[in-house]
Swiss-Prot record:
Record-stated family: Belongs to the GTP cyclohydrolase IV family.
Organism (species): Nitratidesulfovibrio vulgaris (strain ATCC 29579 / DSM 644 / CCUG 34227 / NCIMB 8303 / VKM B-1760 / Hildenborough) (Desulfovibrio vulgaris)
Descriptive protein name: GTP cyclohydrolase FolE2
GO biological process: tetrahydrofolate biosynthetic process
Keyword Hydrolase included in the entry's annotation: yes
Coiled-coil regions listed in the entry: none
Positions bearing the site annotation: May be catalytically important: 145
Catalysis: reaction(s): GTP + H2O = 7,8-dihydroneopterin 3'-triphosphate + formate + H(+)
Top-level taxonomic group: Bacteria
EC number(s) reported in the record: 3.5.4.16
GO molecular function, one term: GTP cyclohydrolase I activity
Record InterPro entries: GTP_cyclohydrolase_FolE2 (IPR022838), GTP_cyclohydrolase_FolE2/MptA (IPR003801)
Keywords: Hydrolase
Role description: Converts GTP to 7,8-dihydroneopterin triphosphate.
Length: 264
C-alpha cells in the first residue's frame, strides 16, 4: 500500500509542530487529600516534521496515547514524550493535557461540603533528551473594590475574579498549593454550596479584605517568589467588574534564580 506521508513534500519547508488536537481520554492525577483523582482530559499532541516529508503519521499519536495508561506526573509525561518521539522519528515532541480538577471545599460557617472545579493545563516538551514542563491553573476568587468601599456610605461593588497561575518547577508540587495560594490572595475564596450563615460570613470577610486586581496579583506573585520549587512563573488576575462593561486585569512574570530568591 502506498505510503503518501513519506513521499517528498511539494514545498520543502520544515514544520515546527504537527499532530492531533482535542483528543479526549480518561486521566488519573495526584490528589493531595485522596491520593488519586479520576478526571477526563482533552489532549493536544505533536512533533516537528522535517522539510522532506510530505506528512506525519497521525495514527501513531493516538496509538501512543492508547498505550499510555499511567498516572499523570512529570516522569510519566517524559516517558510518553519519548515514546511519541521514537514512533514518529522526530527531534521534538509536545503534549498538552487540559483537565478539570475537583476539590471538595467546606463552607466557612456551616461546614457544608461542595465540589469546586478548577481548570488545569499541563504542557510537556522534549527536545534532545531534555524535558520541560509548564503547569497552569485557573482559580476563581471574590474581590471587593477598596475605592468603592472608601467613598460609599453603604456597601461597595464586589465581583468574581480569576487568578491564572503558570509555573515551571524543579520538583513536583501539589495543585492544591497553587489553588490555596491564589485563594488567600483575593478578598475571599468562592464556594459551590453556601447556606445563609455562610453567605453572611463570606460577605463580611470579603468586605473586611478589599482588594484591587493589583493587590491580588502582587500578593500571589510574592507567594510564588517564595515557593522553593518554582524556577519561573506568570500570574494574571482578571476581574469581571460588576459595575463596568469591561474587565480589569493585572499580570506579573518572573524568573526565579538563587540570587533573586527572597531571603537570599
Amino acid at each position: 500500500m502506498e505510503d503518501v506521508q513519506n513521499s517528498p513534500a511539494q514545498v520543502a519547508m520544515p514544520i515546527d509542530r504537527v499532530g492531533v488536537k482535542n483528543l479526549q481520554l480518561p486521566l488519573v492525577v495526584s490528589d493531595r487529600a485522596q491520593g488519586r483523582q479520576h478526571t477526563v482530559a482533552t489532549v493536544d499532541i505533536g512533533v516537528d516534521l522535517p522539510a522532506h516529508f510530505k506528512g506525519t503519521h497521525m495514527s501513531r499519536f493516538v496509538e501512543a496515547l492508547e498505550n499510555w495508561t499511567e498516572e499523570l506526573d512529570y516522569a510519566s509525561m517524559k516517558r510518553l514524550l519519548e515514546d511519541v518521539k521514537t514512533r514518529l522519528e522526530a527531534r521534538k515532541a509536545y503534549v498538552l493535557f487540559r483537565f478539570p480538577y475537583f476539590i471538595r471545599k467546606k463552607a466557612p460557617a456551616t461546614g457544608s461540603p461542595g465540589l469546586v472545579c478548577y481548570q488545569c493545563r499541563l504542557t510537556g516538551e522534549l527536545e534532545e533528551g531534555r524535558p520541560s514542563f509548564l503547569l497552569e491553573v485557573e482559580v476563581p476568587v471574590m474581590t471587593v473594590c477598596p475605592c468603592s468601599k472608601a467613598i460609599s456610605d453603604e456597601g461597595a461593588h464586589s465581583q468574581r475574579a480569576v487568578v491564572r497561575i503558570a509555573v515551571r518547577m524543579t520538583r513536583f508540587s501539589w495543585l492544591e498549593e497553587f489553588i490555596d495560594l491564589a485563594e488567600v490572595s483575593g478578598s475571599s475564596p468562592v464556594y459551590t454550596l453556601l447556606k445563609r450563615e455562610d453567605e453572611k460570613y463570606v460577605t463580611e470577610d470579603a468586605f473586611a479584605h478589599p482588594t484591587f486586581v493589583e493587590d491580588v496579583v502582587r500578593a500571589a506573585a510574592q507567594r510564588l517568589e517564595r515557593h522553593p520549587q518554582i524556577s519561573w512563573f506568570r500570574v494574571e488576575v482578571e476581574s469581571f467588574e460588576s459595575i463596568h462593561c469591561h474587565n480589569a486585569f493585572a499580570s506579573i512574570e518572573r524568573t526565579i534564580t538563587p540570587e533573586t530568591q527572597p531571603g537570599s
